Amino acid sequence: VPVYSPRQINAEPESTNKRSSFRRRVETAFIGITSADYCLAETATLVMKTVPGSDRSISLLPSIHVAVIELNQIIRNLPELYACLKYEGKPPDWGLTNCLTLISGPSKTADIELTMVHGAHGPRELYLYVITSTAAA
């Protein structure tokens, strides 16, 4: 069952049970569907800002991560990302958050006995859908 992050989790005490329930659903989900804030063209890297109400676990725990962005969210590289983040907010914080997740493909590692393992630290598969137009046909 896919899980989608609506970015609406409150910090109120009664929402603790909702968050726990949501977390359990994410932990057992096979597919996680998210948006991303940017995509870096040079490295095909997804950029996801962590903000209150968002849940990074949707992009990390399920075996398959599906991300959806709009065409205008594709930027050239890291220097352009920094410029975008610097000017999208207001001083003194600008658009920077306490955490940026950079995703450049499915999880894989060869640090144990030099054997390639997929999905050790995140999804085994990653799919990106780019929406070119949201205008009504």
Predicted regions and their residues:
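The feature marks the mature, well-folded catalytic cores of soluble enzymes
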Residues: 1-137
